[in-house]
Amino acid sequence: MKIRSTALVKGFRQSAPYVNAHRGKTMVVMLGGEAIADKNFPNIISDIALLHSLGVKVVLVHGARPQINQILEKNQRDTPYHKGVRITDESSLGLVMQAAGQLQHAITARLSMSLNNTPMAGTQLNVVSGNFIISQPLGIDEGVDYCHSGRIRRIDVEGINRMLDLGSIVLLGPIASSVTGECFNLLSEEVATQVAIKLKADKLIGFCPQQGIIDTKGNAIAELFPSDVERLVKSMEQECAPDDEECFSTMRFLRAALKACRAGVPRSHLVSYKEDGALIQELFSFDGIGTQIVMASAEQIRQATIDDIGGIFDLIRPLEEQGILVRRSREQLEQEIHKFTIIDKDGLVIGCSALYPYPEERMAEMACVAIHPEYRDGHRGLHLLVHSKHQAKQMGIRHLFVLTTHSTHWFREQGFNEVDVEALPMAKKSLYNYQRRSKILMLQL
């Protein structure tokens, strides 16, 4: 008899909301030369192919910095830098184009693979490259001629979208042509950023050696706002050693993400190119695995609507089955939905509570407090309590009370005091379930 893996089934079920959310969305994936050189590169390509098979429109922008350095060193060519940009002269341009071209063909070959017993089995991807980017020279700055180092002049947005709509993966590199028929070496971060902005992409995704941005305790920072990124970049500018390419690579992505975020790209993600499956875990799991840069938090506390009933029902049902919450039918939820507040994360209901006012006694009950098991370490229950207190005060409520069988100590920590049944409003007192023997706790507002 075959052993069935419940973990696999659970993973599929948990990822389903994200599969639906990402389908049809445009994501610009920035794959640096460091990621391509890593042994995990084949797995990253498989994950990008998986994104495509799940209905995501993928634009893949690759860099070639370490490969260019390697081929220049091999041919004893030295290219100086000015303000962090490589000066690509006539003699080194051919080598730069060679390195970038080899990577483009290597990526295309990987995406074209469909061998049995591999993650790419059965895939038939169309990978499209072309003159979607028109470049121009950077020119001369402070007397320094950038030669064949350039910047973007325009992007063929219509052409890229047409290829995406036809089901192709669009592959862009750091070499682009100009209207004069010349080739210029561009910063891949700038290509990815401008493409994401012009396409109005839903996400910009980059790779780094670590699991995103790591804090002083060694933990990945799940979410950063633009102001956080600005401070972080300034700190890295002072602390990065001149030869620390990993630090500079991460800093370049943060600058790109900051620019993209402020130009309207909702989210940018930074994940590890060393960790197998990091891209999939970041996009298709509850908490992700890397760092995302957002204009506004992915979580928000808001008034529940009729569309949230399914999410609330799924959240509270396990607690009802355990006897922690009083059972509520779907019909009751529909009738009382205006009394509910939820915590919404990417369209998922991860927390809820309800507020039942008794205006004559100037009292209100906070009930049906539930937090998703994956999110019980983030003080979300406290956030719901603060929100309920604010709502109650606006209604002119003087006392907020709860009935609980399991969370007495937590509510006492928040300032609630235990009272007897007689302290309840008359209407609630008549409905008190003596068999359930819930503790009654009250807070003066």
Curated annotation (Swiss-Prot):
Its EC number is 2.3.1.1. One of its GO terms (molecular function) is L-glutamate N-acetyltransferase activity. Keywords: Acyltransferase, Amino-acid biosynthesis, Arginine biosynthesis, Cytoplasm, Transferase. It is an enzyme of class 2 (transferase). Residues 299-445 form the N-acetyltransferase domain. SUPFAM superfamilies: Acyl-CoA N-acyltransferases (Nat), Carbamate kinase-like. Pfam families: AA_kinase, Acetyltransf_1. GO terms for biological process: L-arginine biosynthetic process. Coiled coil: none annotated. Its main location: cytoplasm. GO terms for cellular component: cytoplasm. Pathway: Amino-acid biosynthesis; L-arginine biosynthesis; N(2)-acetyl-L-ornithine from L-glutamate: step 1/4. It is found in: Cytoplasm. PANTHER family: AMINO-ACID ACETYLTRANSFERASE, AMINO-ACID ACETYLTRANSFERASE NAGS1, CHLOROPLASTIC-RELATED. This is Amino-acid acetyltransferase. It comes from Vibrio cholerae serotype O1 (strain ATCC 39315 / El Tor Inaba N16961). The lineage of its organism: Bacteria, Pseudomonadati, Pseudomonadota, Gammaproteobacteria, Vibrionales. The gene is argA.
